[in-house]
């Protein structure tokens, strides 16, 4: 799973408003009840679905937050990078929207549907960014300018 969007916090409930999503719509709102177990660990309990997620803060991930957004009318040109400390995420949505129903299996269409990037990486002291994990495996170990 992976998405990029906005988080709305009301009391102990978090509502995630997905602007771009790696998966097709599920029919459920993304709402979780959060419990701060420690200053380094958050437990998230599903409200509309039954799940538990455990979020653990990574070392070196508390300073120097930044955001870089490239917006445009062409979906393929949209991109977002966010970072904090020595870590960053890079998100680029697929150009076509995922269909609600199965369509004929056209190879080019299938390739376009999976062309959605969410990459997680690490930034070194000199500013070099290297992708560690990605929805596009060939991006892993790539150095970003």
Residue spans of the language-model regions?
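C-terminal extracytoplasmic interaction modules
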Residues: 7
